[in-house]
């Protein structure tokens, strides 16, 4: 059986909190910002939690987290 390895792209994008939830950054905040309203950009600040439907995929990508 091959070694389990962490997906490095996922390790750079996600942070596992002590309670077991996974933190991720918001999308749609990199470019093409002129057509987005200030309110929309403000709501995209900060981070949020990964949804329950995606947790199995994230856990598989981060086996040691």
Swiss-Prot record:
The keyword Ribosomal protein applies. GO terms for molecular function: structural constituent of ribosome. InterPro entries: Ribosomal_bL35 (IPR001706), Ribosomal_bL35-like (IPR021137), Ribosomal_bL35_CS (IPR018265), Ribosomal_bL35_sf (IPR037229). GO terms for cellular component: cytosolic large ribosomal subunit. NCBIfam families: rpmI_bact (TIGR00001). PROSITE patterns: RIBOSOMAL_L35. Belongs to the bacterial ribosomal protein bL35 family. Gene3D superfamilies: 4.10.410.60. Keywords: Ribonucleoprotein, Ribosomal protein. This is Large ribosomal subunit protein bL35. One of its GO terms (biological process) is translation. Pfam families: Ribosomal_L35p.
